[in-house]
């Protein structure tokens, strides 16, 4: 017969009581009232915060944007085809954040920082909020270091500094993306991390950019964030903030970063779509009232940090597309007023064969010569002045047939200077090469050449100086100044090459 031992039973009961873990979890839930067009209306979710992530029963994530008296408007980060009316939704208590690490370099990711290049998962131990506050006034210092784009027209007349925000604006097919990608290519060996954000573009265009960067070894220091035209509006709206969060990660670790938003017109359109579907009141051009804040809070995150924070920087090159050159539309004027200058690309110049098609007359950099080395300042002032005078004379010369010799000479010089600014795509020049090119033009060495010979001569001159007068480049690189010694080396080199070139061409 089995004997029942009371102490054994009490021990078992005591153990069970000790093992019992009474956990109470409070879950904030709601019910789907309506879903469609990337928007869901939820009843309940009483404690939800603006911008909080919510999770649907079948796994789709959304962002609570509209907090109304009797329902919550949620934008979906996916197609939401499996969400049903009456299904449950729970608030996650988190706001949108992404993992960040050095492992993202060389990868193509989407707005949620998931890889889309088929090369496996990315390991990351840290995470950053997609929307984080911009550095304050005390955290910044003024822009003083140049960020070279490799394009003569920009580096000499519309200089960009590290920590600046410079808008690239122009009609479709005027070379806006080409200017941005050339700038990325020129950062090779400059210890600058680049982030290229493609918003609402064709997948083929993004693939073309990635291939071009890979072929030239630029993907090693570049991250591509891509949300193509078929992505949900929510993800197109988030993509620039994801790019900014990745760039900030490097900026706060005392590194220099360059971020390109291509383009913000498409992000504004995605935001307009979301806002109209959420029944927010439309304003000018049917954009919502806070579309200025959409871009200002993004672009204010670009900064040159103070020495206490390690002097990291984030330079932003936002791109905006205009419709037949109309700079006074809503989005262009907004972004022009937020940025520190703009590079205006003209369809007329592009079609007449001037590439990059930069309209120097209405392009401006509000940082100015603070973002140039001394040697560039020495040669660029004269170039700017002569081109401005040439533009004025050219307009006047159309009405007059008999021009005096001085005017004819000035027009001839201007045409050669304009030729000197032309550059092929994906062929950025170093600062030293730019300085020698500008010096050759502004000091009249090209005046004796035919316009068609100018570019050929300059290519040969750059090669000749590199091999036969390396001292010139060494002096510029070490002193950052066009010294009398450097100038004499340059003059000798130009004279020698000019004689050789004229003999060849005879």
Curated annotation (Swiss-Prot):
Where on this chain does ATP bind?
Answer: 170-177
Q: Where in the cell is it found?
A: Plastid, Chloroplast thylakoid membrane
Alphabetical list of CDD domains matching this protein? ATP-synt_F1_alpha_C, ATP-synt_F1_alpha_N, F1-ATPase_alpha_CD
Q: Which reaction does it catalyse?
A: ATP + H2O + 4 H(+)(in) = ADP + phosphate + 5 H(+)(out)
Q: Which residues carry this modification: Phosphothreonine?
A: 257
Q: Which InterPro entries match?
A: ATP_synth_asu-like_sf, ATP_synth_asu_C, ATP_synth_asu_C_sf, ATP_synth_F1_a_nt-bd_dom, ATP_synth_F1_asu, ATPase_a/bsu_AS, ATPase_F1/V1/A1_a/bsu_N, ATPase_F1/V1/A1_a/bsu_N_sf
The record places the site described as Required for activity at: 363
Annotated membrane topology is: Peripheral membrane protein
State the GO CC annotations.
chloroplast thylakoid membrane; proton-transporting ATP synthase complex
Q: Which EC class heads this enzyme's classification?
A: translocase
Tell me if Ion transport is a UniProt keyword of this record.
yes
- Which HAMAP family does this entry report, sorted A to Z? ATP_synth_alpha_bact
Tell me the PANTHER family matching this sequence: ATP SYNTHASE SUBUNIT ALPHA, MITOCHONDRIAL
Q: What is this protein called?
A: ATP synthase subunit alpha, chloroplastic
Q: Which gene encodes it?
A: atpA
């Amino acid at each position: 017969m089995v004997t029942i031992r009371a102490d054994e039973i009490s021990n078992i009961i005591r153990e069970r009581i000790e093992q019992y873990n009474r956990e109470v979890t409070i879950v904030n839930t709601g019910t789907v009232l309506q879903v469609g067009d990337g928007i869901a209306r939820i009843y309940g979710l009483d404690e939800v915060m603006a911008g909080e992530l919510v999770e649907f029963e079948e796994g789709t994530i959304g962002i609570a944007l509209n907090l109304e008296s009797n329902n919550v408007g949620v934008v979906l980060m996916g197609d939401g085809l499996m969400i049903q009316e009456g299904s449950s939704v729970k608030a996650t208590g988190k706001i949108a954040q992404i993992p960040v690490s050095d492992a993202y370099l060389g990868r193509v990711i989407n707005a949620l920082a998931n890889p889309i290049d088929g090369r496996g998962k990315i390991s990351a131990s840290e995470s950053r909020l997609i929307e984080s506050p911009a550095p304050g006034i005390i955290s910044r210092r003024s822009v003083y270091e140049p960020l070279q784009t490799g394009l003569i027209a920009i580096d000499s007349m519309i200089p960009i500094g590290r920590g600046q925000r410079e808008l690239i604006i122009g009609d479709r097919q005027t070379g806006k993306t080409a200017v941005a990608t050339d700038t990325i290519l020129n950062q090779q060996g400059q210890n600058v991390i680049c982030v290229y954000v493609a918003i609402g573009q064709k997948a083929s265009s993004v693939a073309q950019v990635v291939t071009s960067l890979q072929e030239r070894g630029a993907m090693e220091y570049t991250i591509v964030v891509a949300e193509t035209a078929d992505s949900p509006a929510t993800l197109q709206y988030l993509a620039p903030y994801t790019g900014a969060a990745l760039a900030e990660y490097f900026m706060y670790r005392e590194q220099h970063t360059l971020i390109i938003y291509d383009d913000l017109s498409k992000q504004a359109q995605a935001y307009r779509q979301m806002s109209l579907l959420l029944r927010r009141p439309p304003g000018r051009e049917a954009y919502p009232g806070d579309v200025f804040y959409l871009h200002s809070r993004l672009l204010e995150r670009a900064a040159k940090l103070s020495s206490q924070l390690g002097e990291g920087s984030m330079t932003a090159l936002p791109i905006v597309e205009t419709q037949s050159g109309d700079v006074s539309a809503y989005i262009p004027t907004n972004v022009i007023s937020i940025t520190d200058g703009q590079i205006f690309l003209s369809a007329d110049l592009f079609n007449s064969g001037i590439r990059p098609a930069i309209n120097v007359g209405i392009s401006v950099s509000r940082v100015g010569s603070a973002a140039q080395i001394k040697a560039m300042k020495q040669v660029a002032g004269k170039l700017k002045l002569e081109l401005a005078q040439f533009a004025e004379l050219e307009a006047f010369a159309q009405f007059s047939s008999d021009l005096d010799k001085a005017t004819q000479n000035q027009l001839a010089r201007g045409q050669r200077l304009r030729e000197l600014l032309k550059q092929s795509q994906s062929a950025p020049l170093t600062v030293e090469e730019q300085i020698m090119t500008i010096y050759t033009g502004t000091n009249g060495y090209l005046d004796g050449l035919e316009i068609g010979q100018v570019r050929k001569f300059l290519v040969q001159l750059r090669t000749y100086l590199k091999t036969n007068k390396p001292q010139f480049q060494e002096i510029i690189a070490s002193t950052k100044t066009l010294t009398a010694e450097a100038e004499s080396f340059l003059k000798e080199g130009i004279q020698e090459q000019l004689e050789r070139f004229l003999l060849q061409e005879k």
